[in-house]
């Protein structure tokens, strides 16, 4: 039988990782032991938090039964929503397979809690590209702008801090809802910590106490030991094919928060008079529970992968956001290559490391909702899942790629090493 380390080296070699790349990665990994230990501690806390919420709400095998048709009296669906509310510190929750993605969840939360004549304010700069059409920044059918809902935006200061003076000036009698995007999206600004989100919410409510503060929590669940609801957010929104689905949920989104806000969203999702009472869970409810149970552990692996990627590419001279030493507040790692070929090579490496479609070569394409070609690498069990190992980005300067996910740390590690291998083979990096 082979020595364990030798066997691992040979397995990496079988997968196409050279000794030079593996040695470089191993030296970086050794530097990260203390940070990895802290990630494990956070995962343990969040795992216990999820279990406590499940036990409090008496989750049973009956909860896994599929419902169909109207979905009246769906025990599993209703119990899961109480689990989400308790785990995230909210009054109520809407967790449904009928919410198709994160953008849908955000659109639902906005459209159900805003009325013609209201104004939406983003105090953290431009939102995700896909939200531009929801809001009406880029004209689109059914946007908020078409319904007479206006939009205001205050950019972050050059150092990434909130522009408190600008925010104060922007809040007016029409300001009904403030949207706070936690993650950076396709930008290189810092991701917001829960603490900073709490400070921003407190400032906004000191000016206008009745304003609704909504946090787009995509990519942020279970990264810290607290969530935005616990620091004053009225609504928190996310996708089940990101962190809270644990890689098992095949579809879905959630909205948690104040009861009135969640009820408004439920009536918009279904219809007035029906709200949360309808909406069959079909055959996915067990995967929703099991994915949520596994989510803290899955997120910990994704975090390790993000830090590993940052450290490796920082050592090679690339700009990385966050850098290799910063605290983490989401699972996304941005690497600026300033080179189209390097960006594409990175994505090819992520795809080549996948268990699914590893033989496919990703290419830039005109993805709906974006104003430039986008390249995506994602050999995932669930199409579009970004808690699974994936990388993507708009193919335009500074040619920044956004890496995230990995259902296990070891798969995330392989993906990063494979990305490095592709760059190394094409003489786009030197490992000296």
Task: Kindly give the residue locations of the regions a language model identified.
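Short glycine-rich or small-residue beta-strand-to-loop segments that form or flank ligand, phosphate
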Residues: 63, 67-68, 94-97, 331-336
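Conserved C-terminal alpha-helix-loop-beta "cap" of PLP-dependent enzymes
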Residues: 314-431
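Solvent-exposed, charged/polar functional surfaces in cytosolic regulatory/catalytic domains
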Residues: 83
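Structural motif
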Residues: 92-95, 118-121, 176-177, 210-213, ...
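Conserved PLP-enzyme active-site core in the AAT-like
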Residues: 2-29, 33, 40, 50-56, ...
């Amino acid at each position: 039988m082979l020595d364990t380390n030798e066997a691992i080296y040979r397995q990496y070699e079988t997968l196409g990782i050279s000794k030079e790349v593996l040695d470089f990665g191993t030296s970086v990994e050794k530097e990260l032991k203390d940070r990895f230990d802290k990630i494990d501690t956070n995962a343990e806390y969040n795992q216990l938090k999820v279990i406590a919420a499940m036990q409090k709400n008496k989750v049973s095998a009956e909860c896994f039964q599929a419902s169909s048709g109207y979905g009246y009296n769906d025990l599993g669906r209703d119990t899961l929503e109480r689990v989400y509310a308790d785990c995230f510190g909210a009054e109520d929750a809407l967790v449904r397979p009928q919410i198709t993605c994160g953008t849908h969840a955000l659109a639902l939360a906005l459209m159900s809690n805003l009325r013609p004549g209201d104004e939406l304010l983003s105090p953290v700069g431009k939102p995700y590209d896909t939200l531009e059409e929801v809001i009406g920044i880029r004209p689109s059918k059914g946007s908020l702008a078409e319904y007479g809902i206006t939009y205001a935006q205050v950019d972050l200061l050059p150092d990434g801090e909130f522009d408190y003076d600008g925010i104060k000036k922007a809040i007016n009698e029409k300001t009904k809802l403030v949207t706070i995007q936690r993650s950076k999206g396709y930008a290189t600004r810092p991701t917001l910590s829960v603490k900073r989100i709490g400070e921003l919410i407190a400032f906004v409510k000191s000016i206008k106490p009745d304003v609704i503060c909504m946090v787009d929590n995509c990519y942020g669940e279970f990264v810290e030991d607290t969530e935005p609801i616990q620091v004053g957010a009225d609504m928190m929104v996310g996708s089940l094919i990101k962190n809270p689905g644990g890689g098992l949920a095949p579809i879905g989104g959630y909205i948690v928060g104040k009861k009135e806000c969640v009820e408004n969203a439920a009536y918009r999702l279904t219809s007035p008079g029906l709200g949360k009472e309808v909406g069959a869970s079909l055959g996915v409810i067990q995967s929703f529970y099991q994915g949520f149970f596994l989510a803290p552990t899955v997120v910990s692996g994704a975090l390790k992968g993000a830090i590993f990627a940052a450290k490796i590419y920082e050592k090679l001279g690339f700009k990385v956001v966050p850098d290799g030493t910063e605290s983490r507040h989401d699972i996304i790692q941005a690497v600026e290559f300033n080179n189209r070929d390097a960006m594409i090579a990175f994505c090819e490496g992520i795809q080549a490391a996948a268990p699914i479609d590893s033989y496919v070569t990703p290419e830039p394409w005109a993805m709906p909702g974006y104003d430039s070609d986008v390249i995506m690498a994602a050999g995932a069990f669930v199409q579009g899942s970004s808690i699974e190992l994936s990388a993507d980005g708009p193919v335009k300067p500074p040619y920044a790629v956004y890496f995230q996910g990995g259902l296990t740390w070891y798969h995330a590690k392989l993906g990063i090493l494979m990305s490095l291998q592709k760059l190394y083979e094409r003489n786009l990096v030197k490992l000296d």
